[in-house]
Amino acid sequence: IREAGSTAVEELAFTLANGIAYVQAAIDKGLDINKFGKRLSFFFNCHNHFFEEIAKFRAARRMWAKIMQDRFGATEDKAMMCRFHTQTAGSTLQAQQIDNNVVRTTLQAAASVLGGTQSLHTNSRDEALALPTENSAQLALRTQQIIAHESGISDVADPLAGSAYVETLTDELENLATALIEKIDDLGGAVSAIDQQFQQNEISSSAFDYQKSIDKGETIMVGVNKYKSNEEKVPEMQAMDQEAVNKQLTRLGEFRDPE
């Protein structure tokens, strides 16, 4: 959802609205909310705005607990937990000055952990250009390991709780996302809203606005629309085995058209 261009609020609202649809479908089939609720998990993206992303994750955890308890009647704590995986935002990676992507990914990874993610994937610095090299993939992994074992960020749950700014931002995101979920409910739920192109249109509009803000220089992207380099080095890129590519294309063609 976020990689397609949604805002943080839209990602939060649309993701949880989808969750509501799945839970309701399971309950309609007679499943016990306290049993299957423990096994639900979500997938979130982490974008560039450090504190907004932390607040988004905090709001998600709070909102999902309320949804499971108030809307669906869950009574067990584990059935109300918002378990989620986070991937750093591939759409924020830039082809220019690719080493800058290491910094972007590090900040996104740190925000994910501070927000309470249970698992994490860090993108490699060269993924805006090609499949990552082994060195780039290892650096992305080491980013996670340094955050986990050297920074102290993971020593305590929700370390930014009580921060006036973070708490206010969390409340704001929750209120905006809740209002958007209510709008989806008015459209008949997530599935019906998708059929009416509601989510798609909202995401498309947000993606256009965000790209326009970069193109106009309103949103600064270091190395892209500000602090450019006139002597850009050609980075090492993963070499593709063209023979293997051709074989796979042949197999795919045979699968699609066996005759």
Regions found by a protein language model. Give the residues of each.
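A broad, low-amplitude sensor of folded, mature protein cores
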Residues: 64, 118-119, 143, 258
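Flexible, glycine-rich loop/tail regions that form catalytic "lids" or insertion modules at the edges
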Residues: 134, 142-145, 149-259
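Flexible, glycine/charged-enriched surface loops at secondary-structure junctions
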Residues: 28-38, 68-82, 119, 150-160, ...
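Generic beta-strand/beta-sheet core signal
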Residues: 43-47, 85-89, 105, 122-125, ...
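Helix-rich catalytic cores of soluble enzyme domains
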Residues: 1-111, 125-141
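Metal- or metallocofactor-binding catalytic centers and their adjacent structured scaffolds
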Residues: 115
